[in-house]
Design a protein with these regions (language model features):
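N-terminal cap/lid segment of alpha/beta-hydrolase-fold proteins
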Residues: 1-23
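The serine-hydrolase catalytic nucleophile loop
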Residues: 35-47
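Conserved alpha/beta-hydrolase
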Residues: 47-69
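Hydrolase active-site cap/lid region
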Residues: 114-160, 179
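Short beta-strand/loop motif that positions the catalytic acidic residue
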Residues: 176-178, 183-185, 189
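Conserved alpha/beta-hydrolase "acid-adjacent" motif
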Residues: 190-194
Length: 194
């Protein structure tokens, strides 16, 4: 709808706009999880359902994921927080609800804790304890030599592991969030347990 979106590094952020109410300035941004992208079936289905209900939606891939510019090995939570800022810049003046899944949930918490442009926040199975996640899921994988969940398209980088460890947890950001926030999390989630 608004043409190309680029992040701070000049990398293109691939995105698809789903028109809901053409007269509305309300917009739901949909952020994916680690190893995901904007074209994951449930992200597409959610965007289509929102548009059918009259709600404008934008699904996008963080840099290094899907058809966005950049390298997957450069993708970190901190970089994705900045990417989300670039998307918010492109949609200045809109009333934004951000829905983030898994790692995208952690991105939303960190961005919403510092950016009042996010007016509503939804975390779907949001990553909370990032350092624990890194060790639990990838602690036996050598960065630069191994892959996330044995997926060759998703090489594990030292930058990713260092970023998760440095963040530690997003719990410290939670008290800074001053907008309505919905947490949706299944108690049987084995990738991001409660």
């Amino acid at each position: 709808m608004f043409g190309e979106i680029k992040n701070f590094h000049g990398e293109r952020i691939d995105h698809t706009f789903h028109q809901g109410d053409a007269n509305s300035k309300n917009l739901v941004l949909l952020g994916h999880g680690v190893t995901g992208n904007k074209d994951r079936p449930f992200i597409v289905t959610l965007a289509e359902a929102l548009a059918a209900a009259g709600v404008n939606a934008l699904r996008f891939s963080f840099a290094g994921n899907g058809a966005s510019g950049g390298q997957f090995t450069d993708a970190t939570i901190s970089k994705e927080v900045a990417d989300l800022g670039s998307v918010l810049d492109a949609y200045a003046g809109w009333n934004i609800c951000y829905i983030g899944h898994s790692m995208g949930g952690a991105v939303g918490v960190l961005r919403a804790s510092q950016d009042p442009r996010i007016r509503l926040l939804v975390s779907l199975s949001g990553m909370v304890r990032t350092a624990a996640f890194a060790q639990r899921e990838f602690g036996t994988v050598k960065p630069g030599a191994g892959c996330m969940w044995d997926d060759e398209a998703c090489p594990l980088s030292q930058a990713y592991m260092d970023d998760l460890t440095q963040i530690g947890t997003v719990l410290d950001a939670a008290p800074k969030i001053k907008v309505p926030w919905l947490l949706v999390h299944g108690k049987e989630d084995d990738v991001v347990p409660i």
